[in-house]
Regions:
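Nucleotidyltransferase catalytic core that binds NTPs
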Residues: 2-233, 238-244, 249
Length: 249
């Protein structure tokens, strides 16, 4: 008996690589993770998902602004930076990718988060829950070769350090955390978007940030308002006159 052509067809198992992060704001570290993601995919599909969380302290950028900045900063990955309001967590990313027909999945993350995600994602494989359902043949969590750039206290340039630079109005150091190809206009826009999300005013002068050396500990205490209390009596050294402290700092 002659078989039909369809009998010879073997359905190919679709495989995808992805990452998920806060990226608030995006940094050169996130770019390296995306480069690692593409490299490990070796021509297979890959996707970049970002958190939709927003707050003044750790997530100053809105979801839409973050997507815009990511696509501008990393044009070679722009098409892989996904906009999907239904994906708010890494687990929801798996649900979305499973519904898209993928059956093998690989998550690329900082090496310090491998165990966390490996446990979490495999725990719900084949389990119906509030987040939805997925049932992959394989779930692998792979190291991007470095620590998560979203982690607090990461060595080098991290999102937490970038937020600190924006809060302290230090554009010079903030710009050092961006890819060299990012132009000044886009860098300033990101800087001000972060400040705006923190409830701070927009910066227009972008003066160089200069840290002056400590002249004396006594002077530093005076500047910080730690040397005297309001109403204290002081003797002016040059004239020996007695004065009253009315302003601190």
């Amino acid at each position: 008996m002659i078989k039909n052509f369809k009998d010879y067809l073997v359905e190919e198992t679709k495989e995808v690589y992805f990452t998920f992060g806060r990226m608030n704001p995006p940094t050169i570290g996130h770019g390296k993770v995306m480069d690692a993601l593409k490299s490990k995919a070796r021509g297979a599909d890959y996707r970049v998902y970002v958190s939709q969380s927003q707050d003044a302290k750790k997530n100053p950028l809105s979801y839409s602004d973050k997507i815009k900045h990511l696509r501008k900063m990393f044009p070679s990955h722009a098409r892989q930076v996904m906009v999907d309001k239904k994906v708010r967590t890494a687990i929801e990313a798996l649900v979305s990718l499973y519904n898209a027909g993928y059956r093998k999945i690989n998550m690329v993350v900082g090496e310090d988060r491998i165990r966390e995600f490996d446990t979490l994602l495999n725990k719900y494989n084949g389990v119906k829950a509030r987040h939805g359902f997925y049932n992959f043949e394989n779930i692998n969590v792979i190291s991007a070769g470095r620590r998560d750039p979203d982690a607090e206290g990461v060595e080098g340039m991290s999102a937490s350090k970038m937020r600190g630079f924006a809060q302290n109005n230090n554009f010079q150091d903030f710009a050092q955390g961006l890819p060299s190809k990012v132009n000044n206009k886009d860098a300033r826009k990101l800087f001000n978007d972060v400040r705006k999300g923190m409830g701070l005013k927009e910066e227009t002068s972008f003066k160089r940030h200069i840290e002056l050396p400590v002249v004396s500990e006594t002077r530093e205490q005076f500047i910080k308002g730690e040397l005297f209390e309001l109403g204290d009596s002081v003797v002016i050294k040059e004239s020996e006159e007695i004065g009253i402290v009315s302003v601190l700092g």
